[in-house]
């Protein structure tokens, strides 16, 4: 048993500790594209947990600071069988703290969402969002991503449309 634990610790250490040259270090002016999917957790009790899809791109102002544009689609059912659909366009600033294969980050920004609540017509709402996540580099250009973002959209149709998204995805650096 002691041998198995030691072997497992060595394997984990080998995966986590990698040469810094293995992971991509974006330079000023480089770009990346990404896509993600995961649950959307509404802040309002009348909505159920839904799903969130997103795709976008980043432009690096330096090796640790990027501007991000994101297109998103969120769908959640409500009590009574109908649901809410949100489509959004967001602009963010992201700060990365690179650590070998791992690259944790924080981000924040603003956006505009089209909200189509149950029983009402669609309307546009300004929003703010904050969150963070991490990237795990598979090679110099490709990374798996995981993030949690709180999106504060406001009310539409008498209910708040704000939610938290947990997304896993992939990112490719050019």
Report each predicted region and the residues it spans.
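Transmembrane beta-strand segments of Gram-negative outer membrane beta-barrel proteins
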Residues: 25-41, 104-106
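Cleavable N-terminal export/targeting peptides
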Residues: 1-28
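Individual transmembrane alpha-helices with interfacial aromatic-anchor signatures
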Residues: 149, 156-163
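Short secondary-structure boundary/capping segments within folded domains
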Residues: 24-27, 45-48, 57-61
């Amino acid at each position: 048993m002691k041998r198995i634990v030691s072997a497992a610790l060595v394997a984990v250490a080998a995966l986590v500790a990698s040469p810094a040259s293995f992971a991509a270090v974006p330079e000023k002016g480089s770009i990346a594209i990404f896509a993600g999917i995961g649950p959307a957790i509404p802040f309002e009790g009348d909505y159920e947990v839904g799903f969130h899809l997103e795709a976008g791109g980043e432009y690096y102002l330096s090796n640790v600071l990027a501007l991000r544009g994101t297109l998103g689609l969120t769908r959640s059912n409500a009590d009574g069988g109908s649901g809410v659909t949100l489509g959004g366009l967001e602009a963010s600033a992201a700060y990365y703290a690179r650590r070998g294969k791992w690259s944790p980050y924080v981000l924040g920004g603003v956006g505009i969402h089209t909200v189509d609540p149950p029983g009402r017509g669609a309307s546009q709402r300004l929003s703010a969002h904050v969150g963070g996540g991490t990237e795990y580099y598979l090679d110099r250009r490709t990374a798996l991503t995981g993030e949690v973002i709180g999106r504060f959209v406001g009310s539409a149709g008498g209910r708040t449309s704000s939610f938290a998204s947990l997304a896993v995805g992939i990112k490719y650096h050019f």
